[in-house]
Amino acid sequence: MWPSDVGIVALELIFPSQYVDQVDLEVYDNVSAGKYTVGLGQARMGFCTDREDINSLCLTVVSRLMERWSIPYSQIGRLEVGTETLLDKSKSVKTVLMQLFKDNTDIEGVDTVNACYGGTSALFNAISWVESSSWDGRYALVVAGDIAVYAKGSARPTGGAGAVAMLVGANAPLVFDRGVRSSHMQHAYDFYKPDLSSLYPTVDGKLSIQCYLSALDHCYQLYCSKIQKQLGEKFDIERLDAVLFHAPYCKLVQKSLARLVLNDFVRASEEERTTKYSSLEALKGVKLEDTYFDREVEKAVMTYSKNMFEEKTKPSLLLANQVGNMYTPSLYGGLVSLLVSKSAQELAGKRVALFSYGSGLASSMFSLRISSDASAKSSLQRLVSNLSHIKPQLDLRHKVSPEEFAQTMETREHNHHKAPYTPEGSIDVLFPGTWYLESVDSLYRRSYKQVPG
């Protein structure tokens, strides 16, 4: 018998203390007004100086979660990190995090890598561990973190950075639905990092969008099929209270929500198409695989789903809009955004679907139920209260000019694998409690310190 109500007990999320404004970036890049803000749906982009790397981000988010929630480090029995920001081809980020755990060395797990999907894989592994015969009663800790950077050009505004830590255990306020998880895995060269000496990926933008939408189709169809068997009745998007997506940029998320409506329309009965989907009648007979770049179809389903998007998905886009694409934490930044957008009473009892995508490609759709107990001392109320700092902290960030941002990117590009190396970035602008890179010695050994506070 597995433990009851396995899910997310606690959440912590961090983002860089500086950002560049996308309006300023449009002017600096000499592109049309609205290209980044309207076309991509992005407002601000967080970024790291050379003082922060994937190790420091993960050190910060883990120490913050443990302190805020007063969790003894001895209570962690599994720790797994999902990331695609690799500093070492052998040594895992998880092993770097072990310096926080002092005498507790009995901790399973290492790193999981596949583009933006690694955090989800780590989460699934954590759930499986808690539900397995290997579980020893302690918590599993899942960390997802990345620094998303692109070379100069049209993709650079879709960068971002951040990390999330999720404490997984029994009797959780966010409980994962069992038996409905669906996955789609496929070989594709849509986005990959074959040049190990470079910070930047190789990207086929059009193929990447096609792969994302195709994976979404497959996962949603399978998810609906599985949950219909459990419920014994038809299931569509209207049965979900919130739908969260991996967010490369916000406009793609809006298109993705509309894509689920298109899926529902395609598999609807003739009667439903006439009554429920009358405004989409012109789409009768369309094949999903022919519609990835069909502007007319896209416009029709986006118009139809506009109110649905506002209700079910837009509340999850705060961090995607204000920080950018955090890669592996992106989807879970959506979950945090949802949790800080409403009160515990408004969230109680809701079912949330999540779509995770990582290029190459790996994808899954799964769902969770939010506890119906929103009383003053409930685990849900505590979870929401312990995320109340997120919105105010976004406003405490330091705004940086596009020129300084470009110079920072150049510094990172030239020095990211240099040894010995002493970072140039200022420590003064970092948030209190932030871990930062102090130095890299001649043997590439990295040393870290923590900002007081």
Swiss-Prot record:
Alphabetic keyword roster: Lipid biosynthesis, Lipid metabolism, Steroid biosynthesis, Steroid metabolism, Sterol biosynthesis, Sterol metabolism, Transferase
EC main group: transferase
Record pathway: Metabolic intermediate biosynthesis; (R)-mevalonate biosynthesis; (R)-mevalonate from acetyl-CoA: step 2/3
Catalytic activity: acetoacetyl-CoA + acetyl-CoA + H2O = (3S)-3-hydroxy-3-methylglutaryl-CoA + CoA + H(+)
One example of a Gene Ontology biological process annotation: sterol biosynthetic process
Residue numbers annotated as active site: 84 (proton donor/acceptor), 116 (acyl-thioester intermediate), 246 (proton donor/acceptor)
PROSITE patterns: HMG_COA_SYNTHASE (PS01226)
Cited Gene3D superfamilies: 3.40.47.10
GO molecular-function term, one example from the UniProt record: hydroxymethylglutaryl-CoA synthase activity
EC numbers for this chain: 2.3.3.10
Residues that bind (3S)-3-hydroxy-3-methylglutaryl-CoA: 33, 116, 158, 208, 246, 255, 325, 359
Cysteine disulfide partners in this protein: none
Family the entry assigns: Belongs to the thiolase-like superfamily. HMG-CoA synthase family.
Function: This enzyme condenses acetyl-CoA with acetoacetyl-CoA to form HMG-CoA, which is the substrate for HMG-CoA reductase.
Protein name: Hydroxymethylglutaryl-CoA synthase 1
